[in-house]
Amino acid sequence: MASGGGGGGGMEAVEVRFRLDDGSDIGPSMHDQATTVTALKEFVLARWPQGKEIAPRTVNDVTIINAGQVLENNRTLAESRNLAAESPEGPITMHVVVRRSRPERRVKQPPKARPPERIGCGCTIL
């Protein structure tokens, strides 16, 4: 098995291919159905192709989508599968999205308060 993530309990392994945003793939590879989505993300992160312009730094930078559904980290592969959308032959293709790291924002300091302008009033005493 390519990755673990819990007791197998006799579940059949599943062949998964991870499709990257440029159309290239990681895999296909076999994964136990008890494997968590977090473990799948770690698998993808460890095998990320070198030299890509956008690369994840942590599992939090990676989102995996299967059959149009974003997979939750704490769920297993068995819980995340959509049998109606899968082909009986060949690997399951899961899409990998990398969230671009946001540049650190500098906190804008509020502009310095200017003293209120004096609005003059002309009074004439007769």
Curated annotation (Swiss-Prot):
Positions of the Ubiquitin-like domain: 14-79
Classification via InterPro entries: MUB (IPR017000), Ubiquitin-like_domsf (IPR029071), UBL3-like (IPR040015), UBL3-like_ubiquitin_dom (IPR039540)
Top-level division of the source organism's lineage: Eukaryota
SUPFAM superfamilies: Ubiquitin-like
Gene3D superfamilies, per database record: Phosphatidylinositol 3-kinase Catalytic Subunit, Chain A, domain 1 (3.10.20.90)
Covalent lipid adducts (S-geranylgeranyl cysteine), residues: C123
Keywords: Cell membrane, Lipoprotein, Membrane, Methylation, Prenylation
Record carries keyword Nucleus: no
A Pfam family this chain is assigned to: Rad60-SLD_2
GO cellular component: plasma membrane
PTM annotation (Cysteine methyl ester): residues: C123
Subcellular location: Cell membrane
Propeptide: 124-126
TM annotation in the entry: none
Membrane topology summary: Lipid-anchor
Keyword Ribonucleoprotein: no
Protein purpose: May serve as docking site to facilitate the association of other proteins to the plasma membrane.
Name listed for the protein in its UniProt record: Membrane-anchored ubiquitin-fold protein 2
Gene name per UniProt: MUB2
